[in-house]
């Protein structure tokens, strides 16, 4: 059995290819079930996001299995095999394990340390379980990766500090204005950037948010996903909203400025306004910054914040890698211990058979009335004794890192208890 991951990501494939192989969340269990039926696939799980499509597998034979999985992906998504192969990456054994942990920790994301991917990894395991694609190995692998992702976020500061322009705008507003819960925020634009702005504003405590967009319907659809009754209006009403705003964020695709000196005429003299223009081309005319009660920040101002935070996060990567190596060792100890499982199961089965036979003899001697009254207690007692006697030897067998020492112990166990010699699975070459 070999652990492998085969897939593509923002590092290996352009969006045109990624969108062609993307699998909607609701379809993942079906794809998992179909892939699981391939002859060389013992277990599988599919991680599909806007930035990656990765198939985690336990293969009976790595060479034939990888060909089988690649062919399955190409045929099921209607992509020519040579086209797909140009963008695929393959990782085996320890590299595959470490890759999933890096993904869960956000170290392989466009935005270093971003938190959404951990939830997506959790969902991947859940969807694979629905499709009956995962068993002992991948369940343990995902459990370890999720633990690693949680530890990285709780034990380091990798997830702090803005590393996107939209989050940098909100962070700068928070620094300069203080708490956002009483700030009147105006977001102009309901595209992806506008959605991110609203998301970051809500995360930082803002509650008074109005969204403007050319299409009122699109603005309404965008705010609906947040489950809040946020007001929406059209960009044509921008002038009306300027005097009742403390913070304005612009992020439309307009080719000409939306906010000019003329449209700022409604600004009150006693009003202090901060504007964050994160659009390219810019949505706010340069001369607006000349107004005494206006502070204007554009993308270039915000990039400095982004780069400072990115450099800081990069320093955190070494600390994160140390955590991942600890989790990797933990998983590899578990994986190596699988070699002992068949012998352990056989021993447990033999001991349990003896326990049941002797229990039956004892109860028959005690008489029907006593047996019926106390059978449950005696059964629990004998079961507890067996479990306690076997516990330490079983733990020590699994924990033995020296492969040859473990195999000698297994052979001794088989000889002493007259067990059949097991064809134990070989651990991967690490």
Curated annotation (Swiss-Prot):
Molecular function as annotated in GO: glutamyl-tRNA reductase activity; NADP binding
Q: Where is this site: Important for activity?
A: 99
Keywords assigned:
Chlorophyll biosynthesis, NADP, Oxidoreductase, Porphyrin biosynthesis
What catalytic activity is recorded?
(S)-4-amino-5-oxopentanoate + tRNA(Glu) + NADP(+) = L-glutamyl-tRNA(Glu) + NADPH + H(+)
Q: What EC number(s) would the UniProt record show?
A: 1.2.1.70
Q: Which GO annotations describe the biological process of this protein?
A: chlorophyll biosynthetic process; protoporphyrinogen IX biosynthetic process
Q: Which InterPro entries match?
A: 4pyrrol_synth_GluRdtase, 4pyrrol_synth_GluRdtase_dimer, 4pyrrol_synth_GluRdtase_N, GluRdtase_CS, GluRdtase_dimer_dom_sf, GluRdtase_N_sf, NAD(P)-bd_dom_sf, Shikm_DH/Glu-tRNA_Rdtase
Question: Quick one: which residues bind substrate?
Answer: 49-52, 109, 114-116, 120
**UniProt pathway annotation:** Porphyrin-containing compound metabolism; protoporphyrin-IX biosynthesis; 5-aminolevulinate from L-glutamyl-tRNA(Glu): step 1/2; Porphyrin-containing compound metabolism; chlorophyll biosynthesis
Q: What class of enzyme is it?
A: oxidoreductase
SUPFAM superfamilies for this protein: Glutamyl tRNA-reductase catalytic, N-terminal domain, Glutamyl tRNA-reductase dimerization domain, NAD(P)-binding Rossmann-fold domains
Q: What else is known?
A: During catalysis, the active site Cys acts as a nucleophile attacking the alpha-carbonyl group of tRNA-bound glutamate with the formation of a thioester intermediate between enzyme and glutamate, and the concomitant release of tRNA(Glu). The thioester intermediate is finally reduced by direct hydride transfer from NADPH, to form the product GSA.
The UniProt function text for this chain reads: Catalyzes the NADPH-dependent reduction of glutamyl-tRNA(Glu) to glutamate 1-semialdehyde (GSA).
State the family it belongs to.
Belongs to the glutamyl-tRNA reductase family.
Please state what the annotation says regarding this protein's domains. Possesses an unusual extended V-shaped dimeric structure with each monomer consisting of three distinct domains arranged along a curved 'spinal' alpha-helix. The N-terminal catalytic domain specifically recognizes the glutamate moiety of the substrate. The second domain is the NADPH-binding domain, and the third C-terminal domain is responsible for dimerization.
Q: What is this protein called?
A: Glutamyl-tRNA reductase
Q: Organism, per UniProt?
A: Gloeobacter violaceus (strain ATCC 29082 / PCC 7421)
